[in-house]
Amino acid sequence: MTTIQILLMIGFYLGLFVAVVYFTRARMRRVMGALAGGAAFGLVGVSAVALGEAQGWWRVPQSGVAHFHVLLWLGFAISCAPDYLIVWRVVRRFGGWGLAVCVLVSTIIGPPRDYWIAASFPAWMTFASGIAPALADATVYALLVLVGYGVMRLVGGPAREDSLARSNGL
């Protein structure tokens, strides 16, 4: 990915984040928790990219550029934040089972999505053959939900104790 493409992705997900904040009726503490969860997963995501390249599971061509990792971290942080607000609402409604389903769905849907993107845009990322890259990618998606939601819960508190913004009928 080029710098411009990453910045466009960040802008798109920032707009999506604003929409998800509105529709989930999240209060400021929960919004800050989602951003903190995104920042925490950003560290995991950038580390996973580096580990996957070192193991030969995948290759991200721009990873040698100095500012690439910072932009990638910011991209992970912003693009994952809407997910945590959605997971928060699911957990608020369904409890631990809802969280388990979110982890499972993310783990199942994530790798095919990444493989499709890699096939469509090989200049952005390529995967090695075999089962190891797919399992590693699935693990990263499980961590996406667990790490990010865990940090959001530390910052924002338990989902069931949270009140909703705009609960006056709007």
Which residues does each predicted region cover?
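Aromatic-rich, lipid-facing transmembrane alpha helices and their immediate juxtamembrane interface loops
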Residues: 1-170
